[in-house]
Amino acid sequence: MSWRRAASVGRRLVASGRILAGRRGAAGAAGSGMGNSTSSFWGKSTTTPVNQIQETISNNCVVIFSKTSCSYCSMAKKIFHDMNVNYKAVELDMLEYGNQFQDALHKMTGERTVPRIFVNGRFIGGAADTHRLHKEGKLLPLVHQCYLKKKQEERH
């Protein structure tokens, strides 16, 4: 599928609000800007891949489902790194059951390609979509919304 079509699918999903995870306000912290490596949680749980994906999305402001050899994934990570935004990177090619998680992401987002990027509990698209949002000045406000929600949740 072309990048234009993928971007169109991503925009429709974001606009429709169909791709949401658990509690839309996600935990996360601005800081080093470096992504976390995949935890042992992935693939070893008795919960389904979709549930593990949704839990990760709901617990992190920015989640990048990626592969270590993917140049588009590296580009997307660099955008968040350069903005000094912490993100959770889930490297699908490093997981024993990575194909099952990629299949689940395909069902959730309509695309099998990586990266699959979620901000503030919502699917925003792939690398091209993320780059476009950043150039338009819309990416950082999405991240800030998540941190504001997190602060509000901590107060209550």
UniProtKB/Swiss-Prot annotation:
UniProt modified residues of type S-glutathionyl cysteine: C70
Disulphide bridges: C70-C73
SUPFAM superfamilies referenced in this protein's UniProt entry, alphabetically: Thioredoxin-like
Annotated organelle transit peptide span: 1-19
Means of activity regulation: The 2Fe-2S present in the homodimer leads to inactivation of the enzyme. The 2Fe-2S may serve as a redox sensor: the presence of one-electron oxidants or reductants leading to the loss of the 2Fe-2S cluster, subsequent monomerization and activation of the enzyme.
tRNA processing listed as a keyword: no
Positions with a binding annotation for glutathione: K67, Q102, V114
Tissue specificity: Widely expressed. Highly expressed in testis, and at much lower level in kidney and brain.
PROSITE patterns cross-referenced by the UniProt entry: GLUTAREDOXIN_2 (PS51354)
Domain of life: Eukaryota
CDD domains: GRX_GRXh_1_2_like
Keyword Aminoacyl-tRNA synthetase: no
Residue ranges of every copy of the Glutaredoxin domain listed in the record: 50-150
Function: Glutathione-dependent oxidoreductase that facilitates the maintenance of mitochondrial redox homeostasis upon induction of apoptosis by oxidative stress. Involved in response to hydrogen peroxide and regulation of apoptosis caused by oxidative stress. Acts as a very efficient catalyst of monothiol reactions because of its high affinity for protein glutathione-mixed disulfides. Can receive electrons not only from glutathione (GSH), but also from thioredoxin reductase supporting both monothiol and dithiol reactions.
NCBIfam families: GRX_euk (TIGR02180)
The protein, known as: Glutaredoxin-2, mitochondrial
Organism: Mus musculus
Gene: Glrx2
